[in-house]
């Protein structure tokens, strides 16, 4: 890239250098339908920065639960873990690697919906914002990405 195209690239293309995630938990966060008390417990959430998503797409819940970093090793750039308590939240603000093209969020629920895969969520790098956190709701043993607010047009 020459100097002019570098400046244009910086102006017209968003450059995400920090991964901003807000994890918001509902009161019914991590429950088990066979537990009659309906006790909601804290949830371990793993956040993976990946070069590619092939190893993640091929992985099942059990393998990520037991050996996530090893299963994802061929694509893994970085990983973090957070504990999210029911009816509370957690924030993650960490450098986003230049090599990371995807961010995978994996919640280790007691009773995950492995059929629909709602225990994991994948964001492409272009889904991230440089100055705004992506909000992910945790509840009823599922992850849900909250849509970004619509930006007003300047014209």
Predicted regions and their residues:
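Short amphipathic, basic-aromatic surface patches that mediate peripheral association
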Residues: 21-36, 52
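Exposed aromatic-hydrophobic patches
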Residues: 87-96
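Short coil-to-beta strand junction motifs in C2/discoidin
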Residues: 35-46
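A short, solvent-exposed beta-strand micro-motif common in secreted/extracellular proteins
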Residues: 100-111
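Bacterial Sec signal peptide processing site at the extreme N-terminus
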Residues: 1-16
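Soluble periplasmic/extracytoplasmic beta-strand elements of cell-envelope proteins
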Residues: 20-24, 44-48, 104-106
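Glycine-rich, aromatic-bearing surface loops/beta-hairpins
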Residues: 120-155
């Amino acid at each position: 890239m020459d100097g002019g195209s570098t400046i244009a690239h910086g102006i017209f293309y968003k450059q995400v250098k920090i991964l901003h995630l807000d994890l918001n938990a509902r009161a019914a966060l991590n429950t088990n339908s066979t537990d009659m008390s309906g006790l909601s417990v804290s949830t371990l959430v793993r956040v993976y920065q990946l070069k590619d998503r092939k190893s993640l797409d091929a992985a099942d819940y059990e393998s990520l639960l037991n050996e996530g970093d090893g299963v994802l090793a061929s694509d893994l750039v970085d990983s973090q873990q957070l504990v999210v308590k029911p009816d509370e939240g957690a924030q993650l603000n960490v450098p986003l690697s230049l090599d990371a093209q995807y961010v995978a969020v994996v919640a280790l629920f007691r009773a995950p919906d492995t059929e629909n895969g709602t225990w994991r969520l994948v964001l492409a790098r272009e889904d991230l914002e440089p100055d705004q956190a992506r909000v992910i709701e945790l509840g009823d043993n599922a992850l849900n990405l909250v849509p970004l607010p619509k930006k007003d047009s300047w014209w």
